[in-house]
């Protein structure tokens, strides 16, 4: 009673062929209707399928297929119209369960922070549409009504090396809700990463932005990233306070209508802080991010 159908299988057969297929072949046995399956589990991760769109199901299954077969499966899915023609796979690595973290926010809510996946695009759009117009403007520096699919993929379909993205989610895995997003994009010339955040309105002021930044820093420092770079509108005081809480040496400058904040991590040099202008004092109020 109340059980959930779960399919567990190795990603390949004994002779190396993919067990994840774009279509069932003649003679393939079916033990359960495909529409009823909740989870498919391989050694490369867990795909949750129940209630998802065809695009989301196809991407989730490709993500848990053997890396050797993913490009072929993606091309087949594109040919069948299951996914967009411009869909790509930024990473061939398995989803890293070891990079998941559970944190308790100031309001007592428990939130999981996990690596983003290509199949998260639809849920990220949902987070975007919950943001206020001002949140959107201070995040993207322009008025945006909706994120294009390529924009969404930039925020979740990453290689986890020079492009990194973490999501904050609540609820059970089969019905999780994205309440926050943090990502960075590394410059190979400076070894500094530009960072960006989105936090759902109901979680602003609860410390989620700080928790996401801490997780992003932990990941970056483990990969010898030199530091973070923030590009912030002066009126975005919440983000200025969040940047001031970054680890290491903090320096700021202003160019036209943008405040540039650089945080050099302690393992890349001095760990002292240069003072921010009074209006950017991190103790001036609570962090809304």
Predicted regions and their residues:
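Conserved phosphate- and dinucleotide-binding cores of soluble alpha/beta proteins
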Residues: 1-88
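Long, contiguous binding/interaction regions
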Residues: 94-289
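Intrinsic disorder at enzyme termini
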Residues: 83-99
